[in-house]
Amino acid sequence: MKVLVIFAVLSLVIFSNCSAETDEDFFGEESFEADDIIPFIAKEQVRKDKENCIGKHHECTDDRDNCCKGKLFRYQCQCFKVIDGKKETKRCACVTPLHYKMAEMAVSVFKKMFKN
């Protein structure tokens, strides 16, 4: 029964992650012109390079789509409001969301259960 519950939770998290990334990719660029295609391709080629991505807990304010990949999932850029004196600024960092942490924990428990 425990295995069934863990598998169901893991499947649900993976499915929701896949559908969220698909919607984000599909609806991200509403207007797309022919002049934009070459910079777009060059940008995507850079993102595939692991050395040029933004690591965990590093700032991603200017480049929100370039976070590195963690153990199972890609980190997500999460923004926070920082108040310095009376000035409020928006700062972003690459972090692992809570549901990704839960999925990684479920996978590690699942592996430990079937390792023996």
UniProtKB/Swiss-Prot annotation:
One of its GO terms (molecular function) is toxin activity. The keyword Amino-acid biosynthesis does not apply. This is Toxin CSTX-10. PROSITE patterns: SPIDER_CSTX. One of its GO terms (cellular component) is extracellular region. Transmembrane segments: none annotated. Belongs to the neurotoxin 19 (CSTX) family. It is found in: Secreted; Target cell membrane. Expressed by the venom gland. Spider venom toxin that shows calcium channel blocking activity and exhibits cytolytic activity by affecting the outer leaflet curvature and/or pore formation across the membrane. It blocks L-type calcium channels (Cav1/CACNA1) in mammalian neurons at nanomolar concentrations. Furthermore, it produces a slow voltage-independent block of mid/low and high voltage-activated calcium channels in cockroach neurons. Potassium ions, histamine, M-ctenitoxin-Cs1a (AC P83619), CSTX-9 (AC P58604), and CSTX-13 (AC P83919) synergistically increase the insecticidal activity of this toxin. It comes from Cupiennius salei (American wandering spider). InterPro entries: Spider_toxin_CSTX_knottin (IPR019553), Spider_toxin_CSTX_Knottin_CS (IPR011142). Residues 21-47 form a propeptide. Disulfide bonds join 53-68, 60-77, 67-94, 79-92. It comes from the Eukaryota. The presence of a 'disulfide through disulfide knot' structurally defines this protein as a knottin. GO terms for biological process: killing of cells of another organism. Keywords: Amidation, Calcium channel impairing toxin, Cytolysis, Disulfide bond, Ion channel impairing toxin, Knottin, Membrane, Neurotoxin, Secreted, Signal, Target cell membrane, Target membrane, Toxin, Voltage-gated calcium channel impairing toxin. Residues 1-20 form the signal peptide. It holds the Pfam family Toxin_35.
